[in-house]
Amino acid sequence: MDESGETPNTVTVHGPGEFTGDVAQLSGSPSLVSGVARGDCEVYEVSPDALRQILNNHPDLGDVILQAFIARRQLLKGSGTFTGLRVIGSRYSRDTFRIRDFLAENRMPFTWLDLEADPQVDKLLKEFGLTEADTPVVAWGRKLLLRNPSNRELAETLGIRRPLELEVYDLVVVGAGPAGLAAAVYGASEGLSTVVLERTGPGGQAGRSMRIENYLGFPTGVTGAELAERAVVQAGKFGARLPVGTLVTKLTFDNTYPTLHLEDGETVTAKCLLIATGADYRRLDAEGCAQFEGCGLYYAATFNEAQMCRGSNVALVGGGNSAGQAAVFLAAQARKVYLVIRGNDLHKDMSSYLVQRIEQTPNIELLRNTEVRRMSGDRYLKSIEVVNNKTGEVRTLETAALFSFIGAVPWSEWLSPEIERDAKGFVRTGPAVSQSPYWTPRRQPFLLETSHPGVFAAGDVRSGSVKRVASSVGEGAMAVQFVHEFLKEM
């Protein structure tokens, strides 16, 4: 039964010998639907640990169960009748956007009720005894769950952030992008107690891509969300834990092992640590941009953002693959897309197939040698001012949203001084740290090992890495091999 909407609805009917459940059962998270028996019956409850044993020890049966779990979640999200969580809030509210973004990243089905446009809002707020000033709020069915929750509060309420089960793990991975998820799959499948600490949701930058067309094995392309979701299920099958909404604030080496300090004061110790925190896009440096972050200025282009600008003009800044993928995706939603690049050659940093796609899309206008100088509007973004850095020509473009995909800033400020970084903050590894004063062993560092023995880095956060999904996945898998080598030395 689906009890998330106004009235309960039947999702499906199971008979004798069939099984219930979806991907939430792998982590012990609450189910999205409930069950009602029509008569006397006998039901067997299978715990997450027992379920994993079945999946791993009986692969034929495990394949059937996993495929059913994945399909059921997809059917719920695509049914058009499943409400899921209800988020009530303004399209101009940063917190409303943050909540929607967090739910989307974690593949939690939800319905957004726009404070300015949805006719149900007044009725629902009255039922909950709330006013517009109390929004954003999150509800399930007729039950109010939370008022403007933090990501951590939301994760704990939904059961996707659970207490850590161990004090010491063989492998702690910080970051659930492609590198971190690959390490989780390989580490857990090879018998290492593995936990992935993720501050928002799985997938990283890649998880926000609407179509990756050059990833091996997917000739028709794959969304970043689908790739991340399948990796999470795969890691969970082997026993890796992934408590989202877990922010690491500090790394210390008080004892023999690295100790990670979390936002809530909790600590977790690692025999080996993998830093896979990736890199964020650099914040746009244009006049007025601060007031529009999360309500007109965005750093990803998913369905969440596209809802805000359907049928309007939008602009994108950036010349890499992420910008190209976003431009093509948004062109199907927006009236017009302005693609702004500082240089003259789109081929410099973008794959040829994307350049060709952009050139063949009639509602994408490429603005070469151009930079964004100003963003303007009152409560919401109305226009941007751009300047040609060759001619000095200034244009004002009416836009409902600006998407920025420029630069890369590694998330590494939480690291201790023992972990050497380059001038831009990316983590040094391998031969680059062999002469570091923090490197004490007589052997040379492993290729992905940092300046502290037993601490590794992989993916976009690593200095000198290739910023591609396939490369990050390869580095995450490779790091696990070095983890095994290090553990042999202990």
Put a short name on every predicted segment:
Residues 49-79, 139-164:
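Short, structured interface segments
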Residues 228-270, 275, 331-442, 485-489:
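A Rossmann-like FAD-binding core segment of flavoenzymes
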Residues 87, 91-119, 128, 135, ...:
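Beta1-alpha1 glycine-rich phosphate/pyrophosphate-binding loop at the start
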Residues 1-9:
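A short beta-strand-loop-beta hairpin characteristic of the jelly-roll/cupin
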Residues 9-67:
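Cyclic-nucleotide recognition modules
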Residues 84-90, 313-316:
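Short hydrophobic beta-strand segments
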Residues 164-202, 285, 291-293, 299-352, ...:
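Rossmann-like dinucleotide/flavin-binding elements
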Residues 117, 122-174, 189-190, 207-208, ...:
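FAD-binding core/adjacent interface of flavoenzyme oxidoreductases
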